[in-house]
Amino acid sequence: MSNIKNNNDLSKKYDHKICEQQFSLWTTQKELNKKNLKANKNSYSILLPPPNVTGNLHLGHALNGTIQDCLIRFNNLKGLSAYWICGMDHAGIATQTKYEKYLRENKISNKDKSRDEKVADLFEWSQNVGNNIRNQWKNMGFFLDYENEHFTLEKKSNEMVNQVFVKMYNDGLIYRSKTLVNWDIKLQSAISNIEVIKKEVETNLYYIRYYLSNSKDYLLVATTRPETIFVDECLVVNPKDKRYKNYINKFAINPLTNKEIKIIADEYVDIQFGTGVMKCTPAHDFNDYELGKKYKLNIISCFNEDGTTNNYAVGFENLKIADARVKCVEYLEKNNLLEKVEKTISNVGFSERTNAVVEPMMSEQWFVKVSEYSKKVIELQKSSKKIQFFPIKFEKNLINWMTNLNDWCISRQLWWGHQIPVWYKKDSKEIYVGTKPPKNEELYVRDNDVLDTWFSSGLWPITTTDALKSKDALFPTNVLVTGFDIIFFWVFRMMFFSLYLKKEVPFKHCYITGLIRDEHNNKMSKSLGNGVDPNDVIEKYGADALRLFLLSSSSPGEDLCYVEEKVKSCWGFINKLWNSFRYVEMNSSDFNFDEDKTPKNLEDFDKWILNKFNKAYSEFLQQFNKYNFLVSIKKILDFTWDDFCNTYIELSKNRTSNQESKLWVLNYLIKKILILFHPMCPFVTSNLYDNFKFKTKDSILLERLDFKKISNLKESSIEDVLQIINKIRIFNFENKIPNNKVIDIHLEVLNPKLFKISDEVINILNTAKINIVKQDIKSLKPDYVENNYLIFILNKEDLLGSNNEANNIEKIKKEIEFVKSEISRCNGMLSNKSFIEKAPKEKIELEKSKKEKHEMKLKELEKLLSSHK
């Protein structure tokens, strides 16, 4: 027996709120974090994807964090020095726009404030948001090192960002160029290609007449953007298009400026689109821009950075783009230059952050050359040193995306973020790039722009581990858990920087989560109003129930449907675990448990449950190590609920034989179950462990998962006995027979080698209110037919009354119909090509197993039906 003090305040009923208030692990976790941070070997580390300081965490964050917390606890229990690196992201554009919205809503102006004052105000605002996030982490029970928390805009991060920028500039990987970029008019900032979301939009296709110089003849041009005609540089036709062969190298008149523009030929033009004549406006279209460079055309924009027309839109200046389009169309129509208008579907780019239409804009920006390192990432993923993706399909997506990747535009016209470490000399074109200001700083002006937030986020694995003492042990981290939506934004950039700076991968495994959808399989969104606040779920069911639901519903890369009934069911499981623990404790008051001393006189029933546990534990480990949480947790959930609680505990309640072996097994298994479920349900398991009479550690986190397998556990007829009990329970349930009624049965053994009616079999059946009676059964029909025995219920008429034969036959027929429908459903799933191609292997195997069980059940029922005829 342990000398460690127990908490004797365990309430009779499970109350998640009390359980969470009495969580005793904060101190242990704090001490373990200090110890694990200093460890130089047997380390296991995870980097928390830093949440944006823009608001509260949603269910996706809860899923992502719960998976990581589960892995950290699991590996601590395995004896590794598991450490979870945490922090938050300043999230440049997202945070600045959220803050400016807050200012507008509260009628606060910061126009007269300096840049430093604005940054200080936003930093304070972000700290308040950060406090809310921190509280949510704690509400979820996350095993984070709160004393070593990081921020992507902290001093250490800024130093790292500046050092890397300077190094990349000196290595020729960063350059400045005036070029066509994606411009967010709402932000008045450049954004990168992957921050542009393409959406299909119905718009007008305008057919406009471009008259030839000194001629009444004209070419018809189809365009969706008449407001850019002012800066058309030429018309382009395909040299293979016979319709326009005679027009090449002639001149047409710009319908809005009356200036001459040349007609040129290039195979880029799609003969089938519109009229086959294309207007080329290099400053307002990326494809036109490439043609402009090819033919050395002028590249002039008729838009200002705020989305209004400029002086090149002669007669239409200072109009918003949408208004300019209307005015231009009116002018063209009035002057008989508009021939017709058709509806068409266009792929329009929208800002991922502001949802504003993105405009191509000529602008001087900073870029990172990515082609060299994108090739290195592809080469890496083809080598033995590759990062393993779960599921692997996302590795293929990443590689496909990295082929022919454009350079990364890293400058943003914002004030919240890492200011670019570049100074321009006032009286010359000299540029100074450095981690510190130049000498004679007053002669220079610093670049006002900040870096794309993904620059500091891409350095996150290096910044956070370099900031810690045991950086070599923590880098690379073991696994990154992240959503598929930021593979290109973040995962690639971490790989890029790690290969560039460390010449190794930033993490060994990459687990990709799917989306969380509502119970109708709709994506959760504010517009649909179907979002779920994790705080509300925790308030109602507790963090453990939410965590268990999320983990037991998770497969790599698969979407997860939030169903409240399933969370409620998880609460029900935890409640059952609580009651089972109390039963074991109450019955062990006079018992001395020694885990290392397995009783020599274990009964077959004890061996059966220990074998069941060994199998469930082994299968759990096998699947858990592949990140198949849905399958792995189901193994131990089913064991705990069905085998341990509903079978072993229930049948042990009336057991009188061999109490020592029974109590040893009960205590052994309840302890192992608590340890196994701790990574999923830390609050309830730590609370129960604190009250475990025979605990040997101060904390459940100090226990170990390396369970020693108990050998020599051969047992004979227990599965058959339990099958008999199950049949009788079903019989009682279907016929509404009270549980306290004794059922008299006769067992006709068909295979004595496989099934024997021993004293233990009789005792187990007796505990289930089943009495074995020997009787001549020649004139009787069996109620249940099994492979090894027949079951005859002898007191059926007393229990049901007469005339029940027809009812029994009808019930069997209904059950046959149900089983056939289930077999048909399984066949449908297994013949579905999409399911076979996309579903995890474990799900397919599970469906095959279900089908096999249903087919066996059908044979059994058909045999039973024939015996009643």
Curated annotation (Swiss-Prot):
Binding partners and assembly: Monomer.
SUPFAM superfamilies: Anticodon-binding domain of a subclass of class I aminoacyl-tRNA synthetases, Nucleotidylyl transferase, tRNA-binding arm, ValRS/IleRS/LeuRS editing domain
Function per UniProt: Catalyzes the attachment of valine to tRNA(Val). As ValRS can inadvertently accommodate and process structurally similar amino acids such as threonine, to avoid such errors, it has a 'posttransfer' editing activity that hydrolyzes mischarged Thr-tRNA(Val) in a tRNA-dependent manner.
Top-level EC class: ligase
Coiled-coil stretches: 797-869
Record remark on domains: ValRS has two distinct active sites: one for aminoacylation and one for editing. The misactivated threonine is translocated from the active site to the editing site. The C-terminal coiled-coil domain is crucial for aminoacylation activity.
EC number: 6.1.1.9
Location(s) in or outside the cell: Cytoplasm
GO MF term list: aminoacyl-tRNA deacylase activity; ATP binding; valine-tRNA ligase activity
CC annotations in GO: cytosol
Motif 'HIGH' region, residue numbers: 51-61
Catalysed reactions, semicolon-separated: tRNA(Val) + L-valine + ATP = L-valyl-tRNA(Val) + AMP + diphosphate
Binding site for ATP: K526
Family: Belongs to the class-I aminoacyl-tRNA synthetase family. ValS type 1 subfamily.
Domain of life assignment: Bacteria
S-S bonds: none
Keywords: Aminoacyl-tRNA synthetase, ATP-binding, Coiled coil, Cytoplasm, Ligase, Nucleotide-binding, Protein biosynthesis
GO biological process terms, semicolon-separated: valyl-tRNA aminoacylation
Protein name in the entry: Valine--tRNA ligase
Primary localization class, coarse: cytoplasm
InterPro entries: aa-tRNA-synth_I_CS (IPR001412), aa-tRNA-synth_Ia (IPR002300), Anticodon_Ia_Val (IPR033705), M/V/L/I-tRNA-synth_anticd-bd (IPR013155), Rossmann-like_a/b/a_fold (IPR014729), tRNA-bd_arm (IPR010978), tRNAsynth_Ia_anticodon-bd (IPR009080), Val-tRNA_synth_C_sf (IPR037118)
Pfam families: Anticodon_1, tRNA-synt_1, Val_tRNA-synt_C
